[in-house]
Amino acid sequence: MAEGARQAPAPPQTDRPARLDLNELIHQPVRLSIMATLAHAERVDFAFLREHLEVGDSNLSRHLTALEEAGYVLIDKVFERKRARTWLSLTPIGQQAFRAHVAALQRLVAVR
């Protein structure tokens, strides 16, 4: 694996408590909301996400930076019609991490 490359999280182990498979980085409410929104779209505009989640620019930026540093989110800043625009999307590792987190949540809340 190349230096600096991210590795996908290990698949959850079903023989241990589901809470141990929760992803602490994703589990924070704003970051979980970001991941859930991005999981349902190819890409999302920063302004749309800010309004959709009802958070401020700096708060959203801070959480996006944490997710980007983990390799979960791609932040693409472009100029369109002489205007800066920021597009956000999940990376393949981010998609896998989100699916694993959701699976752990489902196991955690399942009636036994």
Predicted regions and their residues:
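Beta-hairpin "wing" of winged helix-turn-helix
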Residues: 70-84
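Accessory beta->alpha helical hairpin/"wing" motif in late/C-terminal subdomains of nucleic-acid enzymes
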Residues: 90-94
